[in-house]
Regions:
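Selective transmembrane helix interface/packing segments
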Residues: 1-270
Length: 270
């Protein structure tokens, strides 16, 4: 359950030649579902009394728009950033929600399909939670970084942004030797800031969802230990109680982590 469906084994901690097919497939499918849900809500929008689905989407749109207004004061930029924030929130929420599926449901179906096709079902790996894959979570945060860099250049100009890279946060001086030293220090601090923001943005989402996935696996092991003994029956009952309690609590984590990821994206872009 902790192995990915990938093209090859990783040769290093960071190996950009490794592709996790399951993360890519589920991310794309859920992105398509996000697009469809928002498109369906927009298509059915009318000035009359809204249905429950339309009302829920309108509340969500208004909520995200208000959050964007408090961070991004340029109305023209908000026309892109606010819908982006909405898409991020819905997409990450849907990806996180995959953690509520039974641990063995889709992997067992996939193993049977691979076995029926003549493959080895014991090595038919499949992980359905894209945000519990560090490459998936970091991919999202890197995308936010690229948008942030784009707006830096768009608003400040390439020259203005380059000037900021070597003059902030410690400023500069008219003395050339000191200006060079300050420029190097400022540039290093800017790189550290961008890197730390991107790492913390992605790893926060990954860490919370990966931990939640592990807890679900541990709870599933309790159910797998069922036997007609006092201990086995106790573990099975504990499996049901713990599974229900953690699933209810995890719903809050799913929404909260999507909200935090969206808010940080708006803050970084803003």
């Amino acid at each position: 359950h902790l192995h990915f469906w990938q093209n090859k084994a990783s040769d290093a901690v960071v190996d950009l030649s490794v592709f996790h097919y399951d993360t890519i497939i589920f991310s794309v499918l859920l992105a398509a579902l996000t697009f469809f849900l928002l498109w369906a809500a927009a298509r059915k929008a009318n000035p009359g009394v809204p249905g429950r689905f339309q009302a829920a989407v309108e509340m969500l749109v208004e909520f995200v728009d208000n959050e964007a207004k408090g961070i991004i004061h340029n109305a023209e930029s908000r026309k892109f950033v606010a819908p982006l924030g909405l898409a991020i929130f819905v997409w990450v929420t849907l990806m996180n929600t995959m953690d509520l599926l039974p641990v063995d449901l889709l992997p067992s179906i996939w193993a049977k399909l691979v076995g029926a096709a003549g493959g080895d079902p014991a090595h038919a790996y499949l992980r359905v939670l894209p945000t519990a894959d560090v490459s998936g979570a970091m991919g999202l945060s890197v995308a936010v970084l690229l948008i942030c860099l784009y707006y830096n250049v768009k608003i400040k100009g390439l020259g203005g942004w380059a000037h900021e890279l070597v003059t902030a946060p410690f400023g500069t001086t008219k003395h050339p030797p000191a200006a060079i030293v300050l420029g190097i220090v400022n540039f290093a601090m800017q790189i550290i800031e961008f890197a730390s923001k991107t790492l913390s943005h992605g790893l926060r989402l990954f860490g919370n969802m990966y931990a939640g996935e592990l807890i679900f696996m541990l709870i599933a092991l309790m159910g797998g230990a069922f036997a007609l003994t006092g201990t086995g029956i106790g573990l099975a009952i504990g499996h049901v109680i713990a599974g229900l309690a953690w699933a209810i609590f995890h719903i809050l984590i799913i929404i909260l982590q999507a909200f935090i990821f969206m808010m940080l994206a708006l803050v970084y872009i803003g």
